[in-house]
Amino acid sequence: MAMPTLDPNAPDFTRRYPNLADPRLGAEATFATDEFFAPKDRMLNPEPAVFIPGKYDDHGKWMDGWETRRRRNGGYDHCIVRLARPGVVKGVDIDTSHFTGNFPPAASIEAAYLPDGEPTDATQWTEIVPSTTLQGNSHAYVAVASTQAFTHLRVNIFPDGGIARLRVYGQPQVDWKGADRTKLFDLAAMENGAYVVEANNEHFGPASRMLMPGRGVNMGDGWETRRRREPGNDWCVIALANPGRIRKIEVDTAHFKGNFADRVSIQAARVVGGTDSSLKTQAMFWQTLLPEQKLQMDLQHYYEAEIADLGIVTHVRFNMFPDGGVSRLRLWGVIE
């Protein structure tokens, strides 16, 4: 499975937060006013959009995305997307790759919180992305300021046309109130609400991929840094899904063979106050949760006895020495 190409011009929210519209996490396009030329499901495909010259089907040119017919009677088209998890949307990427003479001139996005069902005609929608001008074969990145959690989106295109991909970056919201305080939870799982605060280098793959569910599908499905030609090491800071006491750690180098990290260590702290941007410097001085451990290629490494008891922590700094790649990081712990 191909992974989306890193866009150096993409805003930070595309690297920091998971894509809540990822079908691998459970997202689904549930309704569209029209999908004559291309089905709505393609718009959520986690792989980059492709163009296949000369490929046609019964409806015309095959396009990798959602595409509606030409409207002749006024109005506009829309598609309903159920997010993989209820979450606070931080930003969106409306991608029109390969749509040139058939992209919508504009789009907007509305949202609703419907934990127990699907939208109806009576659903009250909140606009989170105002009508935004689109260009063909390009990405429209739009930051979202709302702090409310949503479960569904309504993507409006004016008046018709095609969108190759929709990415909805945000922080999943999990209700921890009734959770078992004796059960181990993966506090580094993005589906539980963990996210990458900052990483010093993400040349070949964003650190957020380490927090994805399941094992990596190939070498592109993980965090990989450039080759380090100077002293030091690579690192990333992760905000845990919930404050907790770490009991078990997994570092998975699946598919990384000639480029896996030689060694790793983890520092941790209970952070009170401050902002995400202030953690970069603080993290250098956090206590050691897991001392340096030698890694092997293409292997799941598990640690329990090696973990220091630091009590309840909220953030970790994951260090790779000196550079390289790691596919997945799991931090199982009991919550506060």
Swiss-Prot record:
One of its GO terms (molecular function) is allantoicase activity. It is an enzyme of class 3 (hydrolase). It catalyses: allantoate + H2O = (S)-ureidoglycolate + urea. Keywords: Hydrolase, Purine metabolism. It comes from the Bacteria. One of its GO terms (biological process) is purine nucleobase metabolic process. Coiled coil: none annotated. The keyword Cell wall biogenesis/degradation does not apply. Its EC number is 3.5.3.4. It holds the Pfam family Allantoicase. Pathway: Nitrogen metabolism; (S)-allantoin degradation; (S)-ureidoglycolate from allantoate (aminidohydrolase route): step 1/1. PANTHER family: ALLANTOICASE, INACTIVE ALLANTOICASE-RELATED. Belongs to the allantoicase family. This is Probable allantoicase. It comes from Ralstonia pickettii (strain 12J). The lineage of its organism: Bacteria, Pseudomonadati, Pseudomonadota, Betaproteobacteria, Burkholderiales. The gene is alc.
